[in-house]
Amino acid sequence: MATSVLDSENCRISCQPYSKWRDKLLPIIQKTAENNRHPFAENVDRALLDSKAFLFLSEDGFVALKPFDGDKVCVLFAYSFTQGATMKYQPEIEALSRKIGAKSIVFHTALEGAFIELCKRLGYRKTSQQEHISTWVKEIG
């Protein structure tokens, strides 16, 4: 399997086979879902196993991206072992999304407070709210 790599001044992420990393990453995904009262772990796991989403690793975290509807990318999950994952990975997520012709990036979150303010500064807008889960979209092209 060919490995796709994006380089920037701040981050280097590479596409990796989920099956190779599942035993290490799935517990992180599950714990995060539990902590946020947002039952997304099974959907993330299944999308990665079925190759409907793609796993990108960096030295300090990972992100799962799922193309959909021909011109959109959903950030199914993003995690960093250090602070600042959103700021750090946003340029790479946008570059990968543009590379496949995406016009927008979507994510769902239970996070609030400072994270929401950061999302607004990065150009995302809230498009819906169901219970404590909000959906955010950023137009990129």
Residue ranges, per PLM feature:
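Short amphipathic alpha-helix that is part of the acyltransferase structural core
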Residues: 1-39
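Short glycine/proline-enriched coil/turn segments at helix->beta-strand junctions
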Residues: 57-61, 101-102, 132
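Hydrophobic beta-strand residues in large extracellular and virion-surface proteins
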Residues: 63-65, 105, 136
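Conserved donor-binding loop and adjoining core beta-sheet/short helix segment
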Residues: 50-85
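Short glycine-aromatic motifs
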Residues: 53, 121-126
